[in-house]
Amino acid sequence: MPDYHTNNVYACPYLATQTVLSGKWNILLLHHIEEGPIRFNELHRRLDRISQATLTKQLRQLEEDGLITRKVYAQVPPKVEYELSEIGQEFRLVLEQIETFGDKYINFVKSKKSE
């Protein structure tokens, strides 16, 4: 049985999920990576407000957390692709729900502003 009254991230499913959601760019990165293997420069183009250093850091963290895999091809120039890992694939349903909620929330905010 999960312990919902703990600070141990790996004992509480809410805290474990919160760690995935906590990175500023994690949700957007996972959204773009879920579409299929993607290269670093393509991610950087899609997220034009993120610096290369921050993108590198966030990708390393997602890889360390086991949510994405990094495949390096032995060629010149170097080619690296990122894709969702097996456990990262499980996060797809969460991303769909986030998108659904986000759309509803945007409409809610717009309707409140027009009142």
Predicted regions and their residues:
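N-terminal intrinsically disordered/low-complexity leader segments
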Residues: 1-9
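Amphipathic alpha-helical dimerization/coiled-coil segments
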Residues: 2, 31, 89-115
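N-terminal helix-turn-helix DNA-binding core of bacterial DNA-binding proteins
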Residues: 8-54, 75, 81, 112
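Residues within the DNA-recognition helix of helix-turn-helix
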Residues: 58
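Alpha-helical DNA-recognition elements
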Residues: 61
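Basic, amphipathic "hinge/linker" alpha-helix immediately C-terminal to the N-terminal HTH DNA-binding motif
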Residues: 74-98
